Regions:
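Conserved metal-binding segment of the jelly-roll/cupin
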Residues: 42-45, 105-124, 133
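A short hydrophobic beta-strand segment most commonly corresponding to one strand
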Residues: 62-64, 121-145
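Transition-metal
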Residues: 1-83, 144-167
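Generic secondary-structure boundary/loop-capping signal
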Residues: 3-4, 28-31, 85, 94, ...
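Active-site glycine-rich loop that binds ribose-phosphate moieties when present
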Residues: 83-113
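Short, well-ordered, mixed-charge alpha-helical segments that flank or form enzyme active sites
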Residues: 50-51, 72-77, 83-88, 114-115, ...
């Protein structure tokens, strides 16, 4: 909350009038350091237009800067071919979605732009600084059948993803 307090006090002087007028006291960027031990969930995020249509402040576009990559580290970004929404749904049901993704090998200092509406997942051995729009909205499409500490699979958001992904 300290950053929000600074924005409230100094308003446009801190972030610029245009940014303050658009985002108010809500800082528009979120920066995370992520170092996954396994593939993260396959997910997608809405863009600003879709987010506002469903009552959210903004969408989520991301950028990953690879701080450290193990020898075989990779990530998934987009599909490896054109697919239809029906093919997407079928691949989720038969657990073959991973076969449709575009995998990219990563190296130290690589940069990846992940626009909103693009399906993606960060792989193991790929420590990144993630710079993103401030948003908590993620539509999880597939979680590799993992079980949480309560013995349950995490919730998926297939309908939301279908409405979000650019096919």
């Amino acid at each position: 909350d300290e950053l929000n307090d600074l924005i409230e006090t100094f308003m446009g002087d801190l972030v610029g009038d245009e940014v303050f007028n658009r985002y108010g006291e809500r800082f528009p960027l979120l920066i995370k350091i992520i170092d996954p031990l396994d593939y993260l969930s396959i997910q997608v995020h809405p863009d600003d237009e879709l987010a506002q249509e469903i009552g959210l402040h903004n969408g989520k576009t991301e950028m990953w800067y690879v701080m450290h990559a193990e020898k075989d580290a990779n990530l998934a970004s987009g599909f490896n071919r054109d697919i239809t929404p029906q093919e997407f749904e079928n691949a989720i049901k038969d657990k073959s979605l991973g076969d449709m993704l575009n995998y990219e090998k990563v190296q130290n200092d690589d940069v990846f732009f992940i626009p909103a509406r693009k399906i993606h997942a960060l792989g193991a051995g790929c420590m990144v600084a993630e710079i993103q729009q401030t948003s908590d909205t993620s539509y999880r499409v597939y979680d590799w059948d993992r079980i949480d500490r309560f013995g349950m699979q995490r919730q998926l958001h297939i309908d939301e993803a279908l409405a979000t992904i650019n096919f």
